[in-house]
Amino acid sequence: MSALANRFVTKMNGLGNAIVVLDLRGTGIVISAAEARAIGQGKGLHFDQLMVLHDPLSPGSAAFMRIYNIDGSLAGACGNGTRCVAWTLLREDHRIGAELMLETAAGQLACLKLAEDRFSVDMGKPAFAWDAIPLAHPVPDTNAVDLARDLAVLPPVDPDALRKASMVNMGNPHAVLFVADQDACDLALVGPVLEHHPLFPDRANISIATVVSPDHIVLKVWERGAGATLACGSAACATLVAAVRHGLAAREARISLPGGDLTIAWRAADDHVIMTGPVTFEFTTRLDPSLFQALVA
């Protein structure tokens, strides 16, 4: 029988971004891509991201998180999922202002409880160097990258936006395209092409953004390994940063995604990006042993 059989998982969402939290602290278990995919087949457990908690690597941290997409691939960051993990670990601590530190492969994330269902997360500093994003080769300016190059057929999106895409790493690689008309861009057609663009050796998250005003941006996101999602916290962070770099937005703005709004602030004092938004608890259940039968046969 799989070591994951009958273990409890918590299903949550952050602005509709489907999250499953699995606490494996104290077990030494590291799940495989196939096991992550199997969990997503459980009743009601289809996820955009699976947040797996392990023993912390650093003193003062509550947990080390491995983050899986629904296809079993690993993600470097998930802002909505991090808020859900913070809610899970601070569930019995009703103090407003309660804090905890979480770790990922991309670094430490400080979480702050603002209300029972609202948290902020310090997502760290954005990276802009071509090899930090990463890109397949150097480019003159990561804030204006021509993604039309190397594509035999251009996806249905504003050509000017495609030729001036902004690259940001917020734990994950992000490409942000600013368009005047969201409805003119079919994300289901644009997202897969750009996610697998030859410039992105690790694939990329694709953000299609419209700046309504300096403090309001409308955004839809194609996540690598997950597809179109109702919300993506790291993409919201990357989009605000890209908008500031383009001179289109203030350093704090409301980012409106299909699932709702996030508040993103890029602090001038230390360059850290702070994401604030809600979480919603759905249910807790046990993992059905039958999910893993094909994997241990």
UniProtKB/Swiss-Prot annotation:
It is found in: Cytoplasm. Its EC number is 5.1.1.7. GO terms for biological process: lysine biosynthetic process via diaminopimelate. The keyword Transport does not apply. Its main location: cytoplasm. It catalyses: (2S,6S)-2,6-diaminopimelate = meso-2,6-diaminopimelate. Pfam families: DAP_epimerase (PF01678). GO terms for molecular function: diaminopimelate epimerase activity. Substrate binds at residues 17, 49, 69, 79-80, 172, 205, 223-224, 233-234. Catalyzes the stereoinversion of LL-2,6-diaminopimelate (L,L-DAP) to meso-diaminopimelate (meso-DAP), a precursor of L-lysine and an essential component of the bacterial peptidoglycan. This is Diaminopimelate epimerase. One of its GO terms (cellular component) is cytosol. It is an enzyme of class 5 (isomerase). The keyword Signal does not apply. The record marks 174, 223 as: Could be important to modulate the pK values of the two catalytic cysteine residues. The active site is at 78 (proton donor), 232 (proton acceptor). Pathway: Amino-acid biosynthesis; L-lysine biosynthesis via DAP pathway; DL-2,6-diaminopimelate from LL-2,6-diaminopimelate: step 1/1. Belongs to the diaminopimelate epimerase family. Homodimer. Keywords: Amino-acid biosynthesis, Cytoplasm, Isomerase, Lysine biosynthesis.
